[in-house]
Each structure stands twice: as structure tokens, then as C-alpha cells.
Regions:
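Class I S-adenosyl-L-methionine-dependent methyltransferase catalytic core
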Residues: 1-197
């Protein structure tokens, strides 16, 4: 996820769904695999003199680790390594998850856009095989959640197509992957989720 977009209306939907799922399934921890890609923030013009955005302001409004302070009975862990090398990132994320395997978890994959497209996936996407590898490491009754942004601008339905793609990527039986959404909060985003059986 780009830090530029942290704490917008999509995060209200995202974290609302995640907290509700964790409560529903009596999980004590949410682990966010952030796929962090830091942004270069624009400069501020003060009377014709350009200057950097103060780091304290940027940190206050755009630090993805701020979610860990959510006042709830849940523990929230954020894997915030910079996502710039796909293999190294996946290996490190798998190690991170194995270190947090002692308690029931909801593991949330949070890329910029979502699942890989049919052609030319890039760092905005999670590959099907990467999603499957993480799903495979979950224990029974743990929850897998996945951020998916709208995939087309032509107005065609997109949610079911991506839901089926994720289900196939996970090699899960039909109907395993469900959808969390609120078209009134963020109509261009859904959170897919599945409970490991």
C-alpha cells in the first residue's frame, strides 16, 4: 500500500471489516502484510520558497503503524518492510508470520491494487502464488483477508471475477472466499476473506 493513501475512507472500510472479522472469529491478533511502497510527498510552497513537508506531520497522518494504537482487545502487528523486491519480501513476510503463529490470527494482505491482472503484474499487485503461500501457512480457524481495489473503469462487474480468482489461487473449495464491503463508505474497494478449515 502507498503511505500516501493511509487513513482515507478506504481505511475506514478496511479496518472496520478486519476488526469485525477478528471479533466474530475470536481472534486475538490482526497481522497486516502491508506491501509498503513509500511515497515521495510533494513540497510546500511558502511565499515562493519550496520546502519539505515536515516529517512530524507526515508521520502523524501517514504512518501505517499508527493502526497498532487502535483501542481494542486486539493486537495489531504491521509488517512494514518496503516492498521493492518480490522474492525477498515474500520470504521476509513468511518469516514474520511464523514468528506470530502462537496465537489465532487474521492475516491481511494489503497491496496497492489487489490480485495480479492477466497481463503485466507489478508491485501494485500480489501474485496468485504469493497469496496461496500465505494461505497455506494458516492454521485451522485462522482468517485470511485480502484488499482488492476496483479493477476496471468500464463499469463492468469486477468483484465476483476477482473473488473467484482468489479462491482458485488459494486452491480453496467453491464458496470459501467471502466479501466484506460497504458501497456507502468506499464503493471501489472490497475485502475478501476466508476462514481456514
Amino acid at each position: 500500500m502507498r503511505d500516501w493513501y493511509y487513513a482515507d475512507h478506504r481505511d475506514l472500510l478496511k479496518w472496520g471489516v478486519l476488526v469485525l472479522l477478528a471479533r466474530r472469529h475470536r481472534l486475538s491478533r490482526i497481522v497486516q502484510i502491508a506491501y509498503l511502497r513509500p511515497s515521495i510527498f510533494p513540497r510546500i510552497d511558502l511565499g515562493g520558497q519550496e520546502t519539505e513537508l515536515p516529517s512530524q506531520v507526515r508521520t502523524h497522518f501517514r504512518d501505517i503503524n499508527n493502526i497498532a494504537a487502535l483501542r481494542d482487545e486486539l493486537l495489531i502487528s504491521v509488517f512494514d518492510r518496503v516492498f521493492d523486491d518480490r522474492k525477498a519480501y515474500q520470504d521476509a513476510a513468511m518469516r514474520y508470520l511464523s514468528n506470530l503463529a502462537s496465537e489465532p490470527r487474521l492475516v491481511f494482505l494489503d497491496p496497492d491494487t489487489g490480485l495480479e491482472p492477466a497481463e503485466r503484474p507489478d508491485l501494485k499487485h500480489v501474485l496468485d502464488a504469493e497469496a496461496h503461500a500465505i494461505w497455506s501457512e494458516l492454521k485451522t480457524k485462522e482468517v485470511f483477508a485480502f484488499y482488492q481495489h476496483k479493477t476496471n473503469r468500464a463499469g463492468r462487474p469486477w468483484i465476483e471475477e476477482k473473488r473467484i480468482q482468489l479462491e482458485k489461487a488459494l486452491k480453496a473449495k467453491e464458496g470459501t472466499v467471502q466479501v466484506g464491503k460497504s458501497m456507502k463508505i468506499a464503493n471501489d474497494v472490497v475485502i475478501f476473506y476466508a476462514v481456514k478449515s
